[in-house]
């Protein structure tokens, strides 16, 4: 069978595009090199709990069209992201708000909190003498002062990036939201939640009635026995591209853009994360879905307790066990999963060169975080796929 589209990657971009293409009467084959569908939003069921295998994914958006779209497929729960920071055993609410300031300084009013922050910011401004911040440390100090920076930003950021804050560019932190209200809701968006039953339910709905194949590496497509038999190729296929366009008229690619071009201009840099996940014999390990560990003495950046994404109140205790994941940030090495683009001057310039190559590829659409070398929240990925021409 020849398809209208071969879609490489079954994450939110690929799955949403496939859904729209099917609605438009197009035929699609979605392939994924992993043994499952869903990309990084895939959930693994453990002890009756949907475990976010590739890290916490909390859906939030101000885009009502996107919110209505996902809710037309699956209902979402009322989960609200309210992380907590642990600094040497001291607990602070996030994002930075009046609860945080009360915990830091014992202040009770917005005016007291503003005065404390302005006092510390003024000290930094005087130190800089009117010059622009030269690095992330100076930028953060100028934005929020020394106490917040040293307890809640400095060491956490250094663990995330693997570098001293003095060696990180200032543009990484353009602004730091500070709220002078008692509100622990991390996001300002109008809509927020988790699909009831987990993200697999959403992916299954998006890909319903669409041909899919897992454990299928796009770059080895021309060697895949199933693909070869599907094509009934009389002679060996010369390349993955030849196989792709033997299968379909058009290609949607959601993998790393540099890999598509065989790294001919050089490799783009990424940050990645790894997880150590375990079952705990307690119904409630930490009392919150996400706790950030903001000091160097703890090697991981945060602990995720997956149960709290979907269980509330007494239902937390209905299951006597829980599942937690320690998240570790690390430098990307070939063979690891790329997570976050490193948007410094070198990588931005290189990405632009790859985008120019991509624009010249006939009948190939590049979309999503990896293929565009951009950090996207989930709603933006879906919005992009909804607006792409079929």
Language-model-detected regions and their locations in the chain:
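N-terminal Rossmann-like FAD-binding beta1-loop-alpha1 element of flavoenzymes
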Residues: 3-30, 389
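Short loop/edge segments at beta-strand edges and connector loops
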Residues: 9, 80, 214-217, 222-223, ...
């Amino acid at each position: 069978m020849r398809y209208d589209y071969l879609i490489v990657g079954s994450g939110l971009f690929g799955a949403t595009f496939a859904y729209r293409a099917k609605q438009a009467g197009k035929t699609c084959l979605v392939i994924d090199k992993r043994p499952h569908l869903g990309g990084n939003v895939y959930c693994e069921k453990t002890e009756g709990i949907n475990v976010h295998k590739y890290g916490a994914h909390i859906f939030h958006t101000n885009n009502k069209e996107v919110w209505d779209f996902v809710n037309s497929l699956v209902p979402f729960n009322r989960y609200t992201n309210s992380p907590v920071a642990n600094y040497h055993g001291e607990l602070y609410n996030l994002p930075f708000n009046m609860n945080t300031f009360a915990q830091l300084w014992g202040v009770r009013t917005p005016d007291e909190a503003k005065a404390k922050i302005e006092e510390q910011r003024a000290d930094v401004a005087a130190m800089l003498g009117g010059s622009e911040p030269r690095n992330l440390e100076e930028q953060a100090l100028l934005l929020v002062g020394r106490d917040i920076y040293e307890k809640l930003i400095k060491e956490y950021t250094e663990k995330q990036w693997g570098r001293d804050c003095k060696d990180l560019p200032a543009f990484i932190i353009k602004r730091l939201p500070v709220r002078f209200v008692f509100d622990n809701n991390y996001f300002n968006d109008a809509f927020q939640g988790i699909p009831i039953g987990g993200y697999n339910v959403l992916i299954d709905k998006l890909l319903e009635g669409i041909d899919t194949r897992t454990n299928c590496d796009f770059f080895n497509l021309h060697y895949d026995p199933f693909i070869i038999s599907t094509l009934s190729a009389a002679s060996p296929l010369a390349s993955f591209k030849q196989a792709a366009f033997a299968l379909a008229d058009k290609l949607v690619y959601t993998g790393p853009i540099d890999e598509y071009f065989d790294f001919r201009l050089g490799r783009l840099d990424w940050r990645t994360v790894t997880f150590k996940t375990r079952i705990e014999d307690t119904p409630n390990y930490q009392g919150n879905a996400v706790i950030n560990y903001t000091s160097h003495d703890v090697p991981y950046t945060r602990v995720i307790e997956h149960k709290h994404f979907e269980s509330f109140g007494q239902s937390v205790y209905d299951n006597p066990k829980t599942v937690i994941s320690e998240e570790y940030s690390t430098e990307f090495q070939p063979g690891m999963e790329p997570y976050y683009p490193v948007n410094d001057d070198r990588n931005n310039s290189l990405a632009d060169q790859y985008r120019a190559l991509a624009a010249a590829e006939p009948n190939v659409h590049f979309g999503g975080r990896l293929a565009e070398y951009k950090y996207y929240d989930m709603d933006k990925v879906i919005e992009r796929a909804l607006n792409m021409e079929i």
